[in-house]
Amino acid sequence: MARFIFITGGVVSSLGKGLASAALGALLQARGYSVRLRKLDPYLNVDPGTMSPFEHGEVFVTDDGAETDLDLGHYERFTGVPARKTDSISSGRIYTNVLEKERRGDYLGKTIQVIPHVTNEIKDFISIGEDEVDFMLCEIGGTVGDIEGLPFFEAIRQFSQDKPRGQCIFMHLTLLPYIKASGELKTKPTQHSVKELRSIGLAPDILVCRSEGPIPVKEREKLALFCNVRADSVIAAQDLKSIYEAPLAYHREGLDQAVLDAFGIAPAPRPTLDTWEDVADRIYNPEGEVKVAIVGKYTQLEDAYKSIAEALTHGGMANRVKVRIEWVDAELFDKEDATPYLQGFHAILVPGGFGERGTEGKIKAAQYAREHKVPYLGICLGMQMAVIEAARNVAGIEEAGSEEFDHEAGKKRFEPVVYHLKEWVQGNHKVSRSADDDKGGTMRLGAYDAALTEGSKVAEVYGSNAIEERHRHRYEVDIKYREQLEACGLKFTGMSPDGRLPEIVEWTDHPWFIGVQFHPELKSKPFDPHPLFKDFVRAAKDTSRLV
């Protein structure tokens, strides 16, 4: 049966609970334990699938089709354990489940209340698969004191009481602000945060304190005294140049040992950290640098493309180069020449997105990459924009566009080279959708197989003619234009197993120009870079030697 580690946060949000959880998971794995990480979000959305990228950042998609918080991406990248639908829950989903049960009569006419019905639903979620792993790490979103988080804090309090003594511990992440005028780290915000936590029945076993530098012994002892934790369980989380140094940094601070001590596990297996030492070496000792432009519409918030940025970093590690990402707003050249904005880059990446805004700029980015022989990777919408560019400027379909944009305009303006996908095959059954369906959870989501053309660039990159990748889209390139586009040199080199849905396109007369309908960034890891990103950065490295 699993031991449970509950990770909470205080003082301010966005301190890095997800990264701390992921790094701890990696350290426990390095000692030979199996782990699973979960995220419990107090917001009332059922999932983040319909939330604005500016509001929430990236939506991370799992193999089984869940739309989840970007922290699950950190969990996967650090541990290599594929996340599942049962690893992410929100207040919205919890309340939906409770109300559905009430409507079915499952509660036998009782009055439905936060305690016990909502808290029981949360506890049931936490318990899923507890016999499968050695450690279950559960991160509670938000900060202590948030009203919407109270049912979750009460649920984990009850959960820890339901389990045998010593089976649950609590790790609290806080901020130690540094006051330059006095040259001091201030512990009072952390003390008050722990006081708030204790007032709702939770006592932290471990304090992880974010700070700009080391925590002096005096401050550690003060925190230990007033927060009622052991001094060696006060862990410094200093600012790092790379998130992938976090496992090594936390190990140096003794986080993994503090966790094992809290559970009374002794003697504990020694960790094997060779993988993370190699990752750190590749990050901090590159042999060159490449410049990659990400041409998108959410570039003001880099978290909107979190997995893409990390996958490029992984590709850089594999090629021993630093990838310098520059964020380019596609709207800047919607109506003008893209050359001044894109010249000098060693590669161009156009990511996914929704809506018409910025799409003309993305089409011009694809055109620039094609005409100037710059390596190009188009992901999801980025592939669709590359196809539309080819249709307009090479195949002679001047009005080529997407049905998505006609839908927004309310009238037909384009020839729909990209159309609204209403039917597809998932496993052994057909999935049907209509324009009247809810927006949430109705896209083509999760892992799907694709068959690659033998001898194609992508087959060479993957080293296989069969792949499985994660998807998140409701629009698709129309197969009826395949012959016309292939006659111009844009080959459809990846298809769904039934041959109906284009998955990959590539220009045969270009050094490296690939568009994919799926999201390869979601499966990339620092110790196992995705083949597409690995080869994309290699192509950028080759280009950098020519300019």
UniProtKB/Swiss-Prot annotation:
UTP binds at S13, K186, T187, K188, P189, T190, Q191, K222. The keyword Nucleus does not apply. The active site is at C380, H519, E521. It holds the Pfam family GATase. Its EC number is 6.3.4.2. Residues 1-265 are annotated as: Amidoligase domain. The keyword ATP-binding applies. GO terms for biological process: 'de novo' CTP biosynthetic process; pyrimidine nucleobase biosynthetic process. It is an enzyme of class 6 (ligase). CDD domains: CTPS_N, GATase1_CTP_Synthase. Mg(2+) binds at D71, E139. Belongs to the CTP synthase family. This is CTP synthase.
